[in-house]
């Protein structure tokens, strides 16, 4: 699609929406961190006797194990199922890492959960000409930095982007163009529509609606009369139309990066070498989001897992990458010599505000 492409009946350029969905997120994290779990059916959640499944690996899903299923039922369906207690702080940390990757491409990100988000890349901060290439680059970065797989859907609205990400799971991506949208929806069973639950689906079936095409054959008045305020939504999505914007409604409080060393470090020069790429990453995120901050925080985790943080605030927002590095290195230097070897080093920037730089170029991207 070119810059002049429009959806029929609309004057504005086609939006470029990406839906990113991590594949079996909680379970994949556990399999990543525990090699003994790889290739085995895994359920993250409570005990096999009294709990509920929070997430299931793809190996477990082959036996019909699903999230929100009672653990007793899951164990009955998959006798070899391995239960793992959830580690939500770990999942949250990885989710923040993934969102930092998103922020390098667009500030318009709507998180749906720790493992799922919409991105509006109609205006692309990196100037990549195709939205599908943005999705691929994001997925490759997620894999490289976290060791986890993500699926992506690319389309011109949120409803279709989410359908597209489901279409090539796991570890794939799919594009639904404006030309494909209506035909893609018309063959879809109503139970596959996001936003149509079992009760609504059963009601639609009772009214003779089994696919998107069946919904499309109804009038708006009929849908409103039978489904209230949701009727109009069902009416329009059956036509591939979804006007909902991607809402970036979460105010970012800080931008940070950290790394865990393969072997513990103690020398100042070695730590500075590790600090420099972290500063680079934080500053890239600042550039991507148009943010500037005043407070630099250094995080040090020692080999015995004790954590200390040290902060310093500037009188005005830090203007450049070198200034950020100077302040971060200064915080580290004050702590030398360190009492113990260091396992992890992190740097973050807070007291954020919008930058004074010129607005990034507005690019209408082809899907």
Q: Residue spans of the language-model regions?
A:
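DNA-contacting surface of Y-family translesion DNA polymerases
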Residues: 10-12, 19, 192, 200-342, ...
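Gly/Gly-Pro- and Ser/Thr-rich, intrinsically disordered tail segments characteristic of DNA damage-repair
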Residues: 1-226, 232, 349, 353-357, ...
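Residues at or immediately flanking beta-strands
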Residues: 149-151, 297, 344-346
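Short Gly/Ser/Thr- and Asp/Glu-enriched loop/turn motifs at secondary-structure junctions
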Residues: 112-116, 155-158, 291-295, 340-344
